[in-house]
Amino acid sequence: MTAPSQVLKIRRPDDWHLHLRDGDMLKTVVPYTSEIYGRAIVMPNLAPPVTTVEAAVAYRQRILDAVPAGHDFTPLMTCYLTDSLDPNELERGFNEGVFTAAKLYPANATTNSSHGVTSVDAIMPVLERMEKIGMPLLVHGEVTHADIDIFDREARFIESVMEPLRQRLTALKVVFEHITTKDAADYVRDGNERLAATITPQHLMFNRNHMLVGGVRPHLYCLPILKRNIHQQALRELVASGFNRVFLGTDSAPHARHRKESSCGCAGCFNAPTALGSYATVFEEMNALQHFEAFCSVNGPQFYGLPVNDTFIELVREEQQVAESIALTDDTLVPFLAGETVRWSVKQ
């Protein structure tokens, strides 16, 4: 006789960092998010990037058109900051409810970020306007100088960019996205109520050994890159502590298989199908399931000044196997934990 499976009921979560891409890829991946999450902060790094209200409205409609009937999902749009962005356009989008936040990519830090910001000084008028109107700044926190080691880029960003910026614009709300280091965990924990962070499932579950020992695992390659074990442990301890300015942001970032399994592969984990169960596994391992709902469903809305979702979902603790791949029009998509047996999954 099998033991009854354990069920975890939580308020419907939100994903505060998500890549949906565009075109056929968007149509394939949207349902994996919209069936579980009430809202998601949608990244603007398309080609070309989303830098105008008009582009954001059109992109939001393409996303909504891809949401299956019966799913109640709201995409929250972001503006891609560039050196030439007009502060008035940004403010208009925020006031009209089109832009929820703006995204700072250091130029060439990650996928489709060649249009990114060359220096914080270059966009200071925009950042000052954001501070004035209360618009959150979302930051990919890595320096991109060629001489700085890839494993050190987040820590260096804190001292050279993040801290000077926050000293200068003390009222600016900042989300330090997808943090990966003890340095960042400590920095956010020691910060004030205007600084928060998101953490991905892969950075909680894995460290760089998992990606590199016994063969390179391209589907664990993302940016910021997985770090050593001490950093992974610091992230796990931060979420397990119940700290209320860290929240769910999957950074789910789909690439077709041939673009991942390549001599020069793309960065990004497509974790939308398995992220929530992965987070539950980590919280269970840390004996911190009492803080799971807040991380998924409460801390984010609280920081953004939005209401929590009023519906609930259930996760069930029973072993299930993750699909090896998901069909695309002319390729396949390999989900995070493909082919593996997972402990927690969303109850259908």
From Swiss-Prot:
Reactions mediated catalytically: (S)-dihydroorotate + H2O = N-carbamoyl-L-aspartate + H(+)
Pathway annotation: Pyrimidine metabolism; UMP biosynthesis via de novo pathway; (S)-dihydroorotate from bicarbonate: step 3/3
Biological processes annotated in GO: 'de novo' pyrimidine nucleobase biosynthetic process; 'de novo' UMP biosynthetic process
One cellular component term from this protein's GO annotations in UniProt: cytosol
Annotated binding of Zn(2+) 1, by residue: H17, H19, K103, D251
PROSITE patterns: DIHYDROOROTASE_1, DIHYDROOROTASE_2
Pfam families in the record: Amidohydro_1
Residues the record lists as binding substrate: H19, L20, R21, N45, H140, L223, H255, A267
Record keywords: Hydrolase, Metal-binding, Pyrimidine biosynthesis, Zinc
Catalytic residue list: D251
Keyword set includes Transit peptide: no
Family statement: Belongs to the metallo-dependent hydrolases superfamily. DHOase family. Class II DHOase subfamily.
The protein's assembly and partners: Homodimer.
Entry protein name: Dihydroorotase
Species lineage: Bacteria, Pseudomonadati, Pseudomonadota, Gammaproteobacteria, Enterobacterales
Encoding gene per record: pyrC
